Amino acid sequence: MDSIFSVFKLFSEQFKASNIQEQATSDTKPESSPDINLGCSPNIKPECSPNIKSSIDVVEDIYPSTQLATQSLVIFSQEIKQIGSPNSPGTHDVSLNLKRKSDKISEDTDQERVVVCESLENKSSSKDKSPSRGRSPKRHKSSKKHKSSKKHKSSKHDKSSKRDKSSKRHKSHKKKDKSHKKRYRSPSSDRSLSRDRSSSRDRSYKKRRLYSRDRSLSRDRSLSRDRSLSRDRSPPRDRSLSRDRSPPRNRSFSRYRSPLRDRSPTRDRSVSRDGLTPESTPFLRSVSPVRRRFNFGKVLENHLPRENLPLTSKFGDGRIYRNKFVNNIYSVVLDDGTKIWYRGEKIIHDYNPTDNTYYIIMDDGAKIWYKGNLVHRDELPAIICANGTKKWYQYNQYDRENDLPSIVGNDGTLVWYINGKISRLNDKPAHITPNGTQKWYKDGKYHRDNDMPAIVEPYVVYKWYQYGLKHRDNDLPAIINVNGDLCWYQHDKLHREEGPAVICKNGKLIWYRHGEKIRQTTASTRGKNEYEYGDIISELYDRFPYILTWNSWNLRNQQNN
């Protein structure tokens, strides 16, 4: 409470001092005004007089307001004195009332100060406006009423009316200020929510946004930014991945090689690179330089393959090649008029241009008959080897009609073929050797029907096959050796459902299931076991009596075949 009393005392002293100064100035002004008018020149008097009057009006407006403030302060100080000490009872309620009154007085004084300042600004601005441009200045309503009040009304009534109107004007001005704050904001505060507000608040929800911000999500970007993701790159960068490389790099894999390397697939390589022997390389023979030059591809016409071109050069012995083509075949006419036909580097014999048939003698002495480029000969062997073996071909594959062997070896081996595959009809062996081995084939695979062996080897074994696989049904062995060993097979795997899959003459018994060995035992020849070897052999001999008479049976079959 002491601090509150001290504050109010200071306020009261300040207002008293200000009232005393204002009264002193108001007393001295009427005396100083005539001196100013006297000292001024006649031209300056009319200009100074309105200014002086306006200042007097302002002082008159301010003076009653200050008197009211001082009166309220005096009353307030008297009430404080009447209250007494702060420790007396009821001081708490009184202090609250005093605070409320002090707040009200401070608000009134602040409002009066604001009104006075605004009136001064309005008067100064109305004087500085349009008179310099030749226009009549717009005077404030308060000034007109002030003049009329001098003529018709008293000064006190006029001042009170001015104060009321100024307070109304102050309230309207505050409303304008509030609307101004709402309608016209600074750019930073107006766009705090990242939007462009319109000029009026009525269209805040139906406003049209700016072009740049309205299309923020789907706007047309600038050329530089729009092409940032899918732009056409500059030529140097666009060609970085799929550019046409420079000639040295572009031709690194598929370049046009030099003549020596370009002819690498067709040139005659050296013996060391091809792995050939001197006997198998024709260009290593003693030939003239001109022919050797042709062999290496130095003389070409229209870049055709070497074998399609004849030689037009002249050998040292006087032979000349003629440019005559018949299916890669050309002729050579000697000086004595004899004609020699060539196919590439090979001399051909018995050439018939009509049928295009001829034969070539190979380096090993074999003769091969051709029809065009295919090995073929009608009713005669197409290949006759140097050792006497004869082979029949029909259009480049083994074949012979009338159930005759396609291969007749010099040792008596006979092999039958049908359409290039070893085979024979009517359940006859397709391969017969001089030692009595017979093999049955069907379409190039071991096969025989009617539960008969597909391989019969003398003194060794009988073998049953089905479509190239060792197989026999009805729980019978697929392999029977002459010595008595027996083996059971199912689809080329050792297998037997009941009993051992392998029975040897020495008494060894082995069980197999689908090619996997299960167990093995040895049977005694003296004691009676489940699988007596003697009983098995005797049973087999009863079923297959030709095992005992193998030699006579083999000779008989050879005579029949």
Curated annotation (Swiss-Prot):
**Where is the sequence biased in composition, kind Basic residues?**
135-156, 165-185
Q: Per the record, which residues fall in region Disordered? A: 20-42, 82-283
Basic and acidic residues compositional bias, start-end: 103-131, 192-203, 211-247, 259-272
Determine the domain of life of the protein's source.
Answer: Viruses
UniProt similarity note = Belongs to the mimivirus L41 family.
Name used for this protein in its record = Uncharacterized protein R871
Species name: Acanthamoeba polyphaga mimivirus
